[in-house]
């Protein structure tokens, strides 16, 4: 891993090189509604509310979005979004949330999880509250640890080391989604979800947004680059004689290269 977060030069270069700092997608239940809302880097603050101004550069108004298949539950919930929320990034790449709505929002945030026992949770953020919901250094450390663990697993499998556990063998095939969760915030308006609610998943709530943060995604690309060049290795059964490898055809090699490619992030 040549990318060194400890050198602030790299952080500054990565952040300044980006035209956008986040992209926001709006959902009603499990349906994506409208177009992704892209926030320029120079707009340090973006507002997401329930009003109808379609022209705001740093204001995503959900009230003007139409959905011909809108559910009655969604119709009842949307007026209560009100003044919504405000997201702000600082010079260090951290992100802060302020709740302007009269109603609480319900948030999935790996950083807040780390402050509450490091277990996945749904965080209820009350009206008028303001707090940090994303920490760039924390996100980087988690993604780096995960990438190093995958690299170690692949090296052990490649070396055909005896006694590799099934967990270690499975670790080499960690998907991109497992990394990207450290680059994304998801929150629902008005209605809660999780173990304490009838709605267990955020996709069951009437109105919610997904915020993709571009600079941790850019860092993730750098972390995954060495893994792209190292195909996963199938575990060998050491109690059986190893079969000689058959020469690969060019067609098979192309197929494997496609499998090794990391899919791009969807907006």
Residues covered by each model-derived region:
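Long, low-complexity, serine/threonine/proline-rich intrinsically disordered regulatory regions
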Residues: 1-78, 82, 120-267
């Amino acid at each position: 891993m040549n990318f060194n977060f400890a050198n602030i030069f790299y952080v500054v270069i990565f952040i300044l090189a980006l035209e956008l700092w986040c992209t926001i997608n709006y959902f009603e239940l499990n349906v994506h509604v409208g177009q992704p809302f892209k926030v320029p880097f120079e707009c340090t603050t973006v507002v997401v509310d329930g009003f109808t101004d379609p022209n705001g550069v740093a204001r995503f108004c959900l009230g003007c979005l139409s959905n011909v298949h809108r559910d009655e539950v969604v119709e009842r919930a949307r007026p209560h979004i009100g003044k919504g929320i405000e997201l702000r990034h600082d010079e260090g790449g951290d992100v802060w949330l302020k709740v302007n709505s009269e109603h609480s929002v319900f948030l999935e945030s790996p950083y807040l999880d780390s402050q509450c026992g490091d277990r996945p949770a749904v965080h209820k953020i009350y009206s008028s509250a303001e707090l940090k919901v994303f920490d760039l250094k924390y996100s980087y450390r988690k993604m780096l640890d995960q990438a190093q663990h995958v690299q170690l697993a692949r090296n052990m499998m490649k070396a055909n080391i005896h006694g590799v556990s099934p967990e270690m063998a499975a670790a080499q095939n960690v998907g991109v989604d497992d990394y990207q969760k450290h680059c994304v915030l998801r929150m629902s308006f008005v209605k809660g979800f999780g173990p304490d609610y009838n709605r267990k998943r955020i996709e069951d709530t009437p109105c919610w947004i997904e915020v993709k943060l571009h600079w941790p995604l850019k860092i993730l690309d750098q972390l995954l680059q060495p893994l792209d060049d190292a195909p996963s290795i199938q575990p060998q059964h050491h109690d059986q004689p190893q079969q000689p490898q058959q020469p690969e055809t060019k067609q098979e090699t192309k197929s494997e290269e496609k499998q090794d490619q990391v899919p791009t992030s969807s907006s």
